[in-house]
Amino acid sequence: MPHPLLPELETLATSVAADQGFELCGIQLLTHLAPMTLEVHIRRSNGVDVNMDDCAGFSGTLGEALESAQLLTEAYVLEISSPGIGETLSSDRDFQTFRGFPVEVVHRDRDDTEQRLEGLLLERDEDTLQINIRGRIKRLPRDHVLSVRLTSPGS
């Protein structure tokens, strides 16, 4: 069950991100850690890669906004990062941005059995997801695809 403050935190982070030319990709509040941790994933609205300076600058601005809003009353750690290895791709933009990157695809086959494939992401359109597995193109019906996750080369 998501933390009750998560919607407010997401709204605040989305607003701060938009003001700085970023998009919010994800947010999590990890209350089981001491101190609790607010993880925020951002990317540039124009598609340019996010670097460490971007994350540091965004962290400062979001940190000030969080303090002003007084949403978190306990000690917390603020972690800012950009999507990378291990991230699940979901939006059309994700699939455009990470074309040619290694991915793990979890899908259901004709027998409704869950299968995992690894290859290079080629394309996702309205009907199919295409990956390159050792030089062969595999087309999967999009409605059979359960998840697509970035992996590291050769993993």
From Swiss-Prot:
This protein's UniProt keywords? Cytoplasm, Ribosome biogenesis
InterPro entries documented for this protein: Ribosome_maturation_RimP, RimP_C_sf, RimP_N, RimP_N_sf
Principal cellular location given in the protein's record: cytoplasm
An example GO CC term for this entry is: cytosol
Indicate where this protein resides in the cell.
Cytoplasm
- GO terms classed as biological process: ribosomal small subunit assembly; translation
Question: Which NCBIfam families would you find in this protein's record?
Answer: PRK14634.1
Which purpose does this protein serve, as stated in its record? Required for maturation of 30S ribosomal subunits.
Task: Tell me its family.
Answer: Belongs to the RimP family.
Please give the name of this protein. Ribosome maturation factor RimP
Which species does this protein come from?
A: Parasynechococcus marenigrum (strain WH8102)
Biological classification of the source: Bacteria, Bacillati, Cyanobacteriota, Cyanophyceae, Synechococcales
